[in-house]
Amino acid sequence: MPRHTVLEFLLHTTTKIGAVFMENTTTSPDVLERFLRYVQINTQSEDANCDQVPSSAVQFDLANVLAEELRELGAEDAHVTEHAYVCAHIPASAGAEDKPALGLIAHLDTTEVAPGAGVKPHIVHYEGGNLVCGTVDGKPVAMSTAKLPALNDLAGEDLVCSDGTTLLGADDKAGVAEIMSLVARIAQDPSLPHPALGICFCPDEEIGHGAELLDIDTFGCKYAYTVDGGPIGELEWECFNAAEATVRFEGQSIHPGDAKGRMVNAGNLFCDFNALLPYVQRPEYTEGYEGFYHLEGVSATVDHATARYIVRDHDAAKFQQKLDLIDAAASMLNQRLGEERVTVEIKQQYRNMAEIVRDYPELIDVAKEAYLACGVEPQVLPIRGGTDGAQLSFRGLPCPNLSTGGYCYHGVNEFVPVSSLVKMTDVLQELVARFA
């Protein structure tokens, strides 16, 4: 089916979701209807194409849908840039015209670390125990309460899941749907208090693009929030300092029978190098403010090996110590070999936005008030990752991160409670009212 036909189908038809028939009527919440449509549009970014923006042409598919919907909701300037940014502005409500404009930002793309095309969302009424989202090869795809204790608090909830063969895409299409549903509420009732709003949906967040092509001056907002967090109530204004380390190992191939004193096995050099990094500072052993070294991939032969690590820490000094240790490990191996066979290339990715956002405590206070007004207890947590808001904050647009309501991102067990989609839209409505 041609791409434009697919988009027309998604825009103008109802969607059968499992045993539940969802229409764009009052029988289902607006935010749910939008979310179910958006997740069916594949938007996976591609790290192999990170030198271009967007990294995948499919991100334009959702971008074009959103721009059209924004125009239908009265955002006359809604448009898609050549780099797949969706940008639009909503005029302030009466009496709030002199208030600073506020930005709301989410990202279009989904990660490529799990299957993301052909998402088939359905609603599971969760009664407790294992959450089974689908079956693959006759076996249930399930999440247990032992692995996710938060499930114990969700018994009786309706949860949107995938069919178990793909991720769901709540990261970050839940955020997209919640922002769009807020815009729809304002279009229906322009008297809802709000300042002028800047709306932006960005490409390639999952591969670290960081919204670097957003024209902040044209966007015209004094502050912004990304809607890209996890379970409802999360409020984040601290993130990792982040870098990528590419380590290359050069070996010397010799016939194994004649190898003594002559062969240098690049694969073994990698193993020696990796063993010099602290075992307990791997992601699977860390939490909270604890940083890590994460081996994302390695390829090796006797002659050549390349390993790619991401390095993370909230504390700038500890972050630098981690980078220094990588250099020291390479130097130690080279010294042992008596020649340079291990080289390190460090690429800085983003910094902890707390350096900027801590000077704007009102952004945190207002967000807390909005959560509490909706009966949600705010949970201020450090982000164990990054958001577009990290780079935007350093570019002059302070930008904390709000929750979407989703769980288990980047995997086939990803889900989001229907009630969280609705409640988070309520939180956004309360939030913008406090800036009016």
Label each region the model flagged.
Residues H4-F21:
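Short, Lys/Arg-enriched N-terminal segments with co-localized hydrophobic residues
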Residues S28-S56, C161, Y350, H410-G411:
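N-terminal capping segment at the start of a domain
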Residues A48-N49, D77, S191-A196, Y279-H294, ...:
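Flexible, glycine/charged-enriched surface loops at secondary-structure junctions
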Residues C50-K99, G103-I105, D109, K120:
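A non-catalytic alpha/beta surface segment that caps or lines the substrate-entry region
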Residues A96-A196, F201, C221:
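Active-site metal-coordination/substrate-binding segment of hydrolases
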Residues L148-L151, E157-A170, D204-D327, S331, ...:
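Midchain, well-structured core segments that form catalytic/ion-binding scaffolds
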Residues N268-Y285, F292-H294, R341, R351-C399:
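Active-site-adjacent substrate-binding region
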Residues T301-D303, E377-E430, F435:
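Zn-dependent metallopeptidase/amidohydrolase metal-coordination segment
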